[in-house]
């Protein structure tokens, strides 16, 4: 008489939940209908879409060769660096103002009646694009880089504040409880237990936001908020495509350079912070081992 072993028994494949197929087809149908409704609302001309590749190719042919000399004479290089300055000032504004607010928004270091309005403040700022903020600031500061810097800085408060809040909420609560048990005040707990754990990550977020702000500052120039965008728009309006291509190429080179340098710095900051934590743990382990060895002698 043969006895079935565990290897002879093949488990049955579980059946999908009843109604899963109909639900998926229903979701797909809703998405398709939403896409068709969106296209109809845009009043898209399909004949124009068919001609678009040929027209785009004609414009690209007019952009070659780029007129770097004419662009340099008009000071476009200075406008590119002005975009970088706008992004840097905006990032500083966002970093300085978002950091203290992030401590008030974190649920592990702040009471609910404090963190709820701060979180809503972050959400409200992030809901307003930089372009709208720049339009608001232009009547106040006038045309120029200050409107762009303020718009980027205010918008960065919401994003950097959210990222910093999430970093604070993910820390180890042990040091906080230890300082609290010894009678340490809230400020002391933040200074000695929270900041050492999150500053490396928050600094990397600042650099990442700077990369985003460099690209945003180039766009803000198109509405007169400083930067290289105004130079690009003027060339496109007058159909000076060789000069426009030169501005685009220079802008892309500067942005890629900043992205590469910032990514390397962020990686070194994060790896260095992990290495410091690992070395401190090894030091504590070694001290424990040597203490045990001394006690056994």
In which residue ranges do the predicted regions lie?
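Membrane-cytosol interface at the C-terminal ends of specific transmembrane alpha-helices
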Residues: 143-209, 260
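N-terminal, non-cleaved signal-anchor transmembrane helix
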Residues: 1-92, 108, 270-297
């Amino acid at each position: 008489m043969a006895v079935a072993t565990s290897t002879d028994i093949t488990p049955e494949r579980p059946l999908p939940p009843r109604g899963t197929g109909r639900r998926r087809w229903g979701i797909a149908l809703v998405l398709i209908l939403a896409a068709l409704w969106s296209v109809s609302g845009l009043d898209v001309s399909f004949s124009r879409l068919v001609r678009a590749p040929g027209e785009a190719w004609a414009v690209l042919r007019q952009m070659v060769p780029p007129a770097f000399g004419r662009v340099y004479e008009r000071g476009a290089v200075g406008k590119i660096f002005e975009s970088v300055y706008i992004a840097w000032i905006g990032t500083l504004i966002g970093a300085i103002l978002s950091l203290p607010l992030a401590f008030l928004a974190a649920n592990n270091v702040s009471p609910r009646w404090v963190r709820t309005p701060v979180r809503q403040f972050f959400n409200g700022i992030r809901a307003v694009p930089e372009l709208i903020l720049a339009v608001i600031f232009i009547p106040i500061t006038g045309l120029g880089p200050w409107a762009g810097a303020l718009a980027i800085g205010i918008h960065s408060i919401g994003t950097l504040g959210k990222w910093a809040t999430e970093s604070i909420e993910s820390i180890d609560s042990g040091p906080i409880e230890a300082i609290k048990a010894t009678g340490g005040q809230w400020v002391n707990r933040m200074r000695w237990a929270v900041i050492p754990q999150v500053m490396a990550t928050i600094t990397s977020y600042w650099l990442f936001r700077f990369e985003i702000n460099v690209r945003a500052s180039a766009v803000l120039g198109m509405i007169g908020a400083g930067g290289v965008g105004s130079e690009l728009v003027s060339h496109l309006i007058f159909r000076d495509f060789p000069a426009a291509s030169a501005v685009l190429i220079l802008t892309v080179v500067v942005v890629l350079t900043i992205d590469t340098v910032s990514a390397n710095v962020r990686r070194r900051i994060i790896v260095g912070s992990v290495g410091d934590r690992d070395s401190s743990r090894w030091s504590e382990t070694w001290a424990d081992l040597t203490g045990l060895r001394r006690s056994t002698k």
